[in-house]
């Protein structure tokens, strides 16, 4: 049995969960999320806990068991406390600023990059060299943060670029002078 899938999910007091027509809906103080369920797993709600079980022992059922347990857990955490990712910008003249609904990035190109985030995602710039991406959908927060990072990935020689706050950039030594 899946080690992750067999653990029950504790239901937070503020969160409400319901299953209708093979769609699980989770609502809380931060918003609502929905996820379509696959036929390989069933979800039971009892005693303030959510249990995910699989219908058989096929390889796909075992894979979906752990996946859907974590998806539901992330949905519950998202609607109660939310998710955020912090990005740091390194480089001379590299900066970010929030302009209306756009994120304006100056990253050493001949032009500025304007990025419009999805409506469910909030982007903040506490200072010109950091960006905070937050929202209730963990996958969407990670996807938007990865998209922003892809505009200028950190390079290994000087470390210039956009990186996650918890990311370690392996540095390389430059060319050494000849004889």
Curated annotation (Swiss-Prot):
Transmembrane segments: none
Assigned GO CC terms: cytosolic large ribosomal subunit
One of the GO BP terms on file: cytoplasmic translation
Key word rRNA-binding present: yes
GO molecular function terms noted in the UniProt entry: rRNA binding; structural constituent of ribosome
Classification via InterPro entries: Ribosomal_uL6-like (IPR000702), Ribosomal_uL6-like_a/b-dom_sf (IPR036789), Ribosomal_uL6_a/b-dom (IPR020040), Ribosomal_uL6_bac-type (IPR019906)
Source species, domain of life: Bacteria
Record's keyword terms, sorted: Ribonucleoprotein, Ribosomal protein, RNA-binding, rRNA-binding
Gene3D superfamilies per UniProt: Ribosomal protein L6, alpha-beta domain
One Pfam family it belongs to: Ribosomal_L6
Family membership noted in the UniProt record: Belongs to the universal ribosomal protein uL6 family.
Record's function text: This protein binds to the 23S rRNA, and is important in its secondary structure. It is located near the subunit interface in the base of the L7/L12 stalk, and near the tRNA binding site of the peptidyltransferase center.
NCBIfam families, alphabetized: L6_bact
Description of how the protein assembles with itself and partners: Part of the 50S ribosomal subunit.
UniProt protein name: Large ribosomal subunit protein uL6
Organism the protein comes from: Chlorobium phaeobacteroides (strain BS1)
Lineage: Bacteria, Pseudomonadati, Chlorobiota, Chlorobiia, Chlorobiales
């Amino acid at each position: 049995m899946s080690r992750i899938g067999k653990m029950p999910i504790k239901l937070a007091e503020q969160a409400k969960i319901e299953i209708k027509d093979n769609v699980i809906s989770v609502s809380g103080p931060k918003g609502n999320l929905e996820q379509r369920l696959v036929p390989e797993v069933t979800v039971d709600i009892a005693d303030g806990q959510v249990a995910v079980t699989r219908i058989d022992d096929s390889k796909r059922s075992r894979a979906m068991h752990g996946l859907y347990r974590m998806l539901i857990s992330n949905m519950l955490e998202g609607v109660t406390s939310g998710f955020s990712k912090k990005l740091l910008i390194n480089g001379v003249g590299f900066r970010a600023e929030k302009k209306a609904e756009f994120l304006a990035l100056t990253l050493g190109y001949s032009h500025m990059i304007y990025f419009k985030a999805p409506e469910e995602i909030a982007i903040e710039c506490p200072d010109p060299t950091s960006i905070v991406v937050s929202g209730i959908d963990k996958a969407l927060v990670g996807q938007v943060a990865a998209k922003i990072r892809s505009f200028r990935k950190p390079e290994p020689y000087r470390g210039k670029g956009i990186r996650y706050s918890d990311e370690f950039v392996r540095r390389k030594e430059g060319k050494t002078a000849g004889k």
